[in-house]
Every structure is written in structure tokens, then in C-alpha cells.
UniProtKB/Swiss-Prot annotation:
Catalytic activities: a 1,2-diacyl-sn-glycero-3-phosphate + CTP + H(+) = a CDP-1,2-diacyl-sn-glycerol + diphosphate; 1-octadecanoyl-2-(5Z,8Z,11Z,14Z-eicosatetraenoyl)-sn-glycero-3-phosphate + CTP + H(+) = 1-octadecanoyl-2-(5Z,8Z,11Z,14Z-eicosatetraenoyl)-sn-glycero-3-cytidine-5'-diphosphate + diphosphate; 1-octadecanoyl-2-(9Z,12Z-octadecadienoyl)-sn-glycero-3-phosphate + CTP + H(+) = 1-octadecanoyl-2-(9Z,12Z-octadecadienoyl)-sn-glycero-3-cytidine-5'-diphosphate + diphosphate; 1-hexadecanoyl-2-(5Z,8Z,11Z,14Z-eicosatetraenoyl)-sn-glycero-3-phosphate + CTP + H(+) = 1-hexadecanoyl-2-(5Z,8Z,11Z,14Z-eicosatetraenoyl)-sn-glycero-3-cytidine-5'-diphosphate + diphosphate
Subunit text: Homodimer.
EC number(s) on file: 2.7.7.41
Tissues where the protein occurs: Widely expressed. Expressed in heart, brain and retina, and to a lesser extent in placenta, lung, liver, skeletal muscle, kidney and pancreas.
Entry protein name: Phosphatidate cytidylyltransferase 2
Organism of derivation: Homo sapiens
PROSITE patterns per the UniProt record, alphabetical: CDS (PS01315)
Lineage of producing organism: Eukaryota, Metazoa, Chordata, Craniata, Vertebrata
Domain of life assignment: Eukaryota
Chain positions covered by the region annotation Disordered: 1-49
Amino acid sequence: MTELRQRVAHEPVAPPEDKESESEAKVDGETASDSESRAESAPLPVSADDTPEVLNRALSNLSSRWKNWWVRGILTLAMIAFFFIIIYLGPMVLMIIVMCVQIKCFHEIITIGYNVYHSYDLPWFRTLSWYFLLCVNYFFYGETVTDYFFTLVQREEPLRILSKYHRFISFTLYLIGFCMFVLSLVKKHYRLQFYMFGWTHVTLLIVVTQSHLVIHNLFEGMIWFIVPISCVICNDIMAYMFGFFFGRTPLIKLSPKKTWEGFIGGFFATVVFGLLLSYVMSGYRCFVCPVEYNNDTNSFTVDCEPSDLFRLQEYNIPGVIQSVIGWKTVRMYPFQIHSIALSTFASLIGPFGGFFASGFKRAFKIKDFANTIPGHGGIMDRFDCQYLMATFVNVYIASFIRGPNPSKLIQQFLTLRPDQQLHIFNTLRSHLIDKGMLTSTTEDE
């Protein structure tokens, strides 16, 4: 007994802080594991039949397969008609529509996370998500306004100040949101709150960044906006039609209804469609000219002298093809060659944006992101491929098309001090004289 007392007396006793931290870690670990298991069993949003009653009655005698065909077809035509209307209304309306689509897509993705974890009553989750959306939009679109509305910004004192300190203001706004998130952390929900913090930021990266690139593409000329979007739409429709009538071979497990027949048929149909649409649009200045802001009329203008990219040129046809079609040359716009790259990406790589979205939906056991469009799902279901396409088009323009922009260089020049402007003027004049574009007589005058 004496021995036992001595052994107990000599055993080290763990400090209370360690015990407390261990129990805290245990509680946190149990909470995280419980969160994951509860998330698996939590009720998830499912797709509902929101087909208009008129269509339901008209198609009641058809099988579910053909009913879905007609519902998708009719509503697709309606969306295409709406697309034509907003194109007719001009670039300003297009930009507003892009912003609305961005907000709706963000709402659909954030709502999925909220529905999965709604039972945990996470503090400030939705408020902070929308606040971060506001911050990121302010950062991206503030840069755009400064680039494309420079004269207007410099004319108005408040806008000039906001433009000058734009990045600092953006960073400050984000820091406020970051501090709010840290202050909202709750002991029993640490891991889950960081999950949702990452969820929000990945959503912002996918949705806001891509929509920002869409608007940049639009400013390069409406043709860079319309052709890529139309190619994705065409590929989606033609892949569905080829798959519906000829589909036999499954393409990918993530989307069991996708077939190789639809994938290949959609590719060839999209390339042909891209060539035809590019040929038609390249002949109109309103589509090919960059969208610029006119300070005199306070409106957008799309009038310019078309670049060589949109002027008909004659190309020699390879000898092998000459023997088949009997033509030696063909007249086409250089942009049509670029349209082949755009349509190829839209049909071969673009669908992987849809496959990515399918994997996301399978992970959360939902059929669609929302029920906004009957037969199609949510807005995000229609734009999952468009966002990937927007990034490609922006990179393609920057790599192969865009050169130095004289108007932007002049804008930057005008912001310099007078002595800096004079120095650049003298340097440029000396350079032009050396090149033989100015004479010494001109210099003396």
C-alpha cells in the first residue's frame, strides 16, 4: 500500500491547460466529424418539375423522353430569342445582363452550401458571402471603369479620387470582411466555418472573375462576345440532338447521358456554325468595332475603320482539296480562321466545364443547381461551360490579337506632369526624325 502511494505521488500530473486544450481539440474533432456525417444525411435541394402547366397539358400523352425533348426545345428557342433581343439592345444592356447572371450564379452555388449546412446556424455566413461578392466586384469593375471611362472619371472629382485610391479601398474593404469572419468564429464550428470560407472564395474565383473577363471580351468588340457564347450554345444543342438520335456509346461516367456520338457530332456542327456566323458578323461594323465610351454623347459607340482581321482576303486552297472541290482560292475573313480555334475549344474543351459541374452536383446529390428554367435547371446549369470559354477567349485575344492600345496610352500620357509630358514628346520627336518620318525642317518649325 505504501509502495502504491509512493508511485502515485511520483507520477507527473498533466497541467490543466493541456487537459483543457486536449478536450477542446477532442470536441473540435468530434464536431468536425459529426458535421461531415450530418452533412451527408442533411436534406439537399432536388430538382422539381417547374414545367409550365400549358406545356404539361399539351405534352401529357408523350413519353417522359420525348416530353423532355419538347420542353427543352421550346425553352431553348425562347432563350435564343431573348439572346437576340439583348444583343439588339446594345453593349450596355449586355453588361447589365452579365452582372445579373453573375449574381444569380453566385446565389445558386452559395444556396447549395447554405442548404447543406443550414442546421448548424453558422453566424454571418450568408452576410459575409454577399459582402465578399460586393468587395470583389468593386475591385474588378473599378479597374474596368478606370480603363474604359478614363475621361469621365478624370472629369468628376469624386470618381477621380476613387480611381486613384481604388486598390487601397478594395483591400481595405476585403480586410473588413476578413476581420468580420475571424470575429464570427465559434468554437464548435471552427472547421466547418473554414470550409464555408473556402467555398465562398472558390465561388468568387469561378463566377466573378469569369464574368469580368466576359465584359473585357465585349469591349474588344461584340463579335468576341457573341461568337464564343453562340458556339457554346450551338455545341450544347447539337451534342444533345446527335446524342438523342444516335447516341449509343457513353462518354464519361460523371454524365451518363453524354455519348461519344453527341460529342463528335457537336464538334463538327459547331465548327461549321462558327465559320458561318463569323462570316456574317464580320461584315458589320457594329459587331467588329471595339466598344468605346463617347464623352460628347455620354454613350457607347461601336463605329471605327475595321481592322485587317475583318476584311475579306483571298487564300490559296491546298492542292489535295483543290482536286476534290475544284477551287484554287477562297475569299474569307481572317477572323473566320480564329473562329475555328474558338469553336474547337467550345466543343472539345468547353464541355469539361459541364462535366466539372456534374461532378459538383453528384458530390452534393443534386440534379440541378436550381429550378429557374424548366427542363434546364438553374442559370449556372446553362453557364457552366460559358465561364471556361470566357477565360479562353480573353487569353486568346491577349496572346494572338490585341496590340498596344493608342487611346489608353494617350490617357496615361495625359495623367503625367507637364515636364514628364514634354520629355516624352521630345523623345518621340527624336525617334520619328531618326526613322525618317519627320524632317529637320519640321523640327525647326
